[in-house]
Amino acid sequence: RHVLELKIIEKAAVNRTAKGLKDMALALKNRAKYAAAENLIACVEADIAFHSAIAESCGNNILTALYDTLSVHVNKFFMEIYKDTTPFLASQQQHENLMQAIKDKNIQQAVAVANQIIQHK
């Protein structure tokens, strides 16, 4: 999963569009809102919507389709391992930073932030 996400993020930093950035921003806003409201199900869905918007922005239909398939399993996994929205609140700023790096087309920064998110640092 990590290799796929990193490749998607690299490509999204190059190929992102205004629509993709808008979709990412909306998903991030919802992620923060649902995390603050302690609505785990909606928060997980918003988190996946954010990463799906990144996948849509990568410009590679195969990678996007792979992520769409993977996201079903990620949802199930997150619902098993997370009991509340605390980890989502804790990683919100990192997700904001990831979107900013993609917006800035800064591949190196986007990958660095993604690695922090993946490693829960």
Q: What are these regions, as identified by a protein language model?
A:
Residues 9-17, 34-38, 58-59, 79-84:
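A ubiquitous short alpha-helical element
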Residues 54:
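Short basic (Lys/Arg) and small-residue
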Residues 1-27:
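Amphipathic alpha-helical dimerization/coiled-coil segments
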Residues 25-37, 45-51, 65-121:
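C-terminal all-alpha effector/ligand-binding and dimerization domain
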Residues 1-11, 61-72:
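Conserved segment of winged-helix/HTH DNA-binding domains
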